[in-house]
C-alpha cells in the first residue's frame, strides 16, 4: 500500500506538476520558441492518450513486476531534455496512425455525437411522458381518496360519529361549532314529572295537621278579632298566619291584665 501511494505521488509530480510548470515558463517568455511550445503540445497530447488508456492497462498488466516504476520512468523519458522522448513517440507512432485514420476517426466522432443526441432526446421524451402520466395518476388517486373519505363520513352511523367526536382533542372540540340539542321525548318528560310528584307526595302530608286550639279561635277555624270579625285561617305558614298568631299572643297577654 505504501509503495503504491509513493508511485502515484511520483506520477503526479513528475508526470503532471513539473511538466505543467515548464510549459508555463515557455508560454510566458517574452520571445516564445515555437519548437519548444510545439514540444509541450505534443507532450500533453501523449499524456491525454496515456491517461485515457491507463485504467485499462492497470487492470490487465498491473500484475507485472515494477509496473508502477516503469510508468514513472516513461513519464520522465517523455519530457527529459536529453532524451525528449515525446518527439520520438509522436513522430514515429502517433502521427502516422492519426494521419492514416483521421477521416475515419472524425466520422466516428460525428456518428457518436448524433447517436448520443438522439439517445438523449428519446429518453428525455419518454421520461417526460412517464412523469406526466405518473403525476396525473397521483392527482387522480388523491381525488378518489378524498371523495371516498367524504362519502364514508356522510354514511357513517350516529354512534360512530359520537365516538369520533369523543376521540377528538380538546382543541378540536373547542373549534367545532356546538351541535343543536335534540328535544327530549314526551314520554320521558311525563314519566319524570310523575316520579317528581310521587316523591313530593311521599315527603309531605296533605292536608297538614290542624294546630291545637288557641284562645280567641272558635271551632270553625276562624279567629275573632277585636271588632268581632271572623278571619279565616286557612293558609298555614303564610305571613298572614304569622301575623294572626302574634295578634293572638298579644290578646292573650292583655286579657289577664284586664
UniProtKB/Swiss-Prot annotation:
<feature type="compositionally biased region" description="Polar residues">
    <location>
        <begin position="156"/>
        <end position="169"/>
    </location>
</feature>
<dbReference type="InterPro" id="IPR004345">
    <property type="entry name" value="TB2_DP1_HVA22"/>
</dbReference>
<feature type="region of interest" description="Disordered">
    <location>
        <begin position="153"/>
        <end position="258"/>
    </location>
</feature>
<dbReference type="Pfam" id="PF03134">
    <property type="entry name" value="TB2_DP1_HVA22"/>
</dbReference>
<feature type="compositionally biased region" description="Pro residues">
    <location>
        <begin position="206"/>
        <end position="215"/>
    </location>
</feature>
<comment type="similarity">
    <text>Belongs to the DP1 family.</text>
</comment>
<protein>
    <recommendedName>
        <fullName>HVA22-like protein j</fullName>
    </recommendedName>
</protein>
Amino acid at each position: 500500500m505504501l509503495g503504491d501511494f509513493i508511485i502515484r505521488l511520483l506520477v503526479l509530480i513528475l508526470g503532471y506538476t513539473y511538466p505543467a510548470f515548464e510549459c508555463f515558463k515557455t508560454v510566458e517568455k517574452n520571445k516564445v520558441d515555437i519548437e519548444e511550445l510545439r514540444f509541450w503540445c505534443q507532450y500533453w497530447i501523449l499524456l491525454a492518450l496515456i491517461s485515457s488508456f491507463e485504467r485499462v492497462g492497470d487492470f490487465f498488466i498491473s500484475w507485472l513486476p515494477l509496473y508502477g516504476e516503469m510508468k514513472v520512468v516513461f513519464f520522465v523519458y517523455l519530457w527529459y531534455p536529453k532524451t525528449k522522448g515525446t518527439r520520438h513517440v509522436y513522430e514515429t507512432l502517433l502521427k502516422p496512425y492519426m494521419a492514416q485514420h483521421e477521416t475515419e476517426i472524425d466520422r466516428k466522432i460525428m456518428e457518436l455525437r448524433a447517436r448520443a443526441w438522439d439517445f438523449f432526446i428519446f429518453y428525455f421524451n419518454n421520461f417526460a411522458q412517464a412523469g406526466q402520466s405518473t403525476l396525473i395518476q397521483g392527482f387522480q388517486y388523491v381525488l378518489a381518496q378524498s371523495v371516498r373519505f367524504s362519502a364514508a363520513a356522510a354514511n357513517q352511523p350516529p354512534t360512530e360519529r359520537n365516538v369520533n367526536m369523543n376521540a377528538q382533542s380538546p382543541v378540536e372540540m373547542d373549534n367545532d361549532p356546538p351541535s343543536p340539542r335534540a328535544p327530549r321525548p314526551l314520554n320521558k318528560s311525563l314519566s319524570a314529572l310523575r316520579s317528581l310528584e310521587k316523591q313530593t307526595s311521599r315527603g309531605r302530608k296533605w292536608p297538614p295537621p290542624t294546630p291545637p286550639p288557641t284562645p280567641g279561635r272558635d271551632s270553625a277555624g276562624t279567629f275573632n278579632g277585636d271588632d268581632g270579625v271572623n278571619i279565616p285561617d286557612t293558609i298555614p305558614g303564610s305571613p298572614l298566619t304569622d301575623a294572626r298568631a302574634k295578634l293572638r299572643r298579644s290578646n292573650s297577654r292583655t286579657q289577664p291584665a284586664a
